[in-house]
């Protein structure tokens, strides 16, 4: 049982690492520009800090098992889909010029904390918040991806710490496959998603998540 748990955790780490590298590769220009743009770096830190603090608290208090209740997943999926729909209706008021305000960064960071609730999409809730604040869909998505870098990095490091003592060398090939698959899929997903939101609304994602949420409720009812 413990061995299976370690295998799953290792595979999740490989997948997280692949996603992390994909975001870094795709946004390498923005990342390198941070060297000359301290305000952007500051805002990324501000937006990331809340989820790190609350994530640590959830782990210490051991309430993550309670949050994994499938009913919570279903209701969160439906509820935050509705939030995304209405937030996406807000007109663009703010131009993201690589220097959003600290207050807006904090709001988006607090919204990201809600992603700790299973069924809540991290990108979905942060984009919802950014759209509500008046950012365009494309700018909202870009900032959401940028603040995912510290989060993915932290998740990877914590995961490695948990399985380091029980690492199985026989799983290296499987982990490389998982990493490579995650990297390729993530790169394609980022490119397709950003191209889509630049020209279209987020309604299709709302519909997909609503369907998934109601399917889960239907499954529970039967």
What are these regions (language model features)?
Residues 1-222:
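Multi-pass membrane proteins that catalyze or facilitate reactions on polyprenyl-/lipid-phosphate substrates
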């Amino acid at each position: 049982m413990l061995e299976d748990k370690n295998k799953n955790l290792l595979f999740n780490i490989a997948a997280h690492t692949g996603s992390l590298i994909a975001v870094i590769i795709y946004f390498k220009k923005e990342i390198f520009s941070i060297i000359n743009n301290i305000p952007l770096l500051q805002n990324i830190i501000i937006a990331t800090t809340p989820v790190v603090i609350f994530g640590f608290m959830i782990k210490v208090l051991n309430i993550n098992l309670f949050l994994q209740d499938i009913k919570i997943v279903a209701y969160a999926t439906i509820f935050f889909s509705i939030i995304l729909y209405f937030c996406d209706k807000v007109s663009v008021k703010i131009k993201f010029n690589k220097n959003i305000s600290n207050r807006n960064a904090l709001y988006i960071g607090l919204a990201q904390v809600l992603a700790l609730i299973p069924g809540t999409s991290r990108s979905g809730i942060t984009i919802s918040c950014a759209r509500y604040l008046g950012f365009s869909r494309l700018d909202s998505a870009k900032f959401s991806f940028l603040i995912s870098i510290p989060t993915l990095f932290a998740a990877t490091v914590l995961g490695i710490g948990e399985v380091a003592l029980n690492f199985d060398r026989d799983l290296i090939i499987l982990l490389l496959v998982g990493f490579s698959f995650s990297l390729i899929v993530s790169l394609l997903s980022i490119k397709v998603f950003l191209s889509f939101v630049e020209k279209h609304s987020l309604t299709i994602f709302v519909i997909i998540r609503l369907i998934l949420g109601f399917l889960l409720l239907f499954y529970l009812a039967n």
